[in-house]
């Protein structure tokens, strides 16, 4: 699925922040301002978004993992939904410091959550006192909320996709430290520095956020489908029937 300029306009991707909050490093992507609000130049945004999606497609075709990060109220639900649709890990609650740089510790929490889920499935709650069962449920809910979206992630991701890079600067810093490429939606009040694939755009409107997140999820599914198609075609190519002329 390719995103059009019209869709971006309708989603309000071009609305930046109030001019007094601007970050001068975003100047190349700003068209002007209206009623003290910066207007983002979508003629810059669209090709940059397409570049990011091309990278996502290639990564997905090579079985890469892309972690979705968006914990603000307006992005949380759609982000979890679309990451789930694409079969990718996501962080939709608070970013825990060290989620990337200290993944070994996070892995311990993931194991704890999975063990608890298995225990519950096996009927462990029936053998507990009311108080123990309540404590168990509380811990499990807390773990599910903080790391449920990354529990199938075996190691650090190949890239992260961040909605609102300023709000998630710890995630961006951790990725930069580990050399993990960052795809990020950058509004007029933040800096594009440290972002490998910048998507200049509104990061506050739920419609705009839905457009970016769906676009990335679609690109992942397309990349995977293309990879499968190539494997099928290669297999077919190897079995071509060739008639040998006798002579």
From Swiss-Prot:
Example of a GO biological process term: translation
User: Mind telling me which Pfam families this protein's record contains?
Assistant: Ribosomal_S2
Which keywords has UniProt assigned to this entry?
Answer: Ribonucleoprotein, Ribosomal protein
Q: Name one GO cellular component term.
A: cytosolic small ribosomal subunit
Q: Which InterPro entries match?
A: Ribosomal_uS2 (IPR001865), Ribosomal_uS2_bac/mit/plastid (IPR005706), Ribosomal_uS2_flav_dom_sf (IPR023591)
Molecular function in Gene Ontology: structural constituent of ribosome
As for family, the record states: Belongs to the universal ribosomal protein uS2 family.
Q: What HAMAP family does this protein's entry cite?
A: Ribosomal_uS2_B
User: What protein name is recorded for this chain?
Assistant: Small ribosomal subunit protein uS2
- Organism of this sequence: Cupriavidus pinatubonensis (strain JMP 134 / LMG 1197)
Query: Which lineage do the record's taxonomy fields give for this organism?
Result: Bacteria, Pseudomonadati, Pseudomonadota, Betaproteobacteria, Burkholderiales
């Amino acid at each position: 699925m390719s995103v059009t300029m019209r869709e971006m306009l309708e989603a309000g991707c071009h609305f930046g922040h109030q001019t007094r909050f601007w970050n001068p490093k975003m100047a190349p992507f700003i068209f002007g301002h209206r009623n003290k609000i910066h207007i983002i130049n979508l003629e810059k945004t669209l090709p940059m978004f397409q570049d990011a999606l091309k990278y996502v497609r290639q990564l997905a075709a090579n079985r890469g993992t892309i972690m979705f990060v968006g914990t603000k109220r307006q992005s949380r639900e759609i982000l979890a939904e679309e990451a789930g649709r694409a079969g990718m890990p996501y962080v939709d609650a608070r970013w825990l410091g060290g989620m990337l740089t200290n993944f070994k510790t996070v892995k311990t929490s993931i194991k704890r959550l999975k063990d608890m889920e298995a225990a519950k499935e096996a009927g462990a709650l029936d053998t507990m006192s009311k108080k123990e069962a309540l404590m168990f449920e509380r811990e499990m809910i807390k773990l599910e909320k903080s790391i449920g979206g990354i529990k199938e992630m075996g190691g650090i991701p190949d890239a992260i996709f961040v909605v609102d890079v300023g709000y998630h600067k710890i995630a961006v810093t951790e990725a930069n430290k580990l050399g993990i490429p960052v795809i990020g939606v950058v509004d007029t009040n933040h800096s594009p520095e440290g972002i490998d694939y910048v998507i200049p755009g509104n990061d506050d409107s739920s419609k705009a956020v839905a457009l970016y997140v769906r676009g990335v999820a679609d690109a992942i599914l397309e990349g995977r489908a293309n990879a499968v198609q190539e494997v099928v075609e290669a297999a077919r190519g190897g079995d071509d029937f060739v008639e040998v002329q006798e002579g």
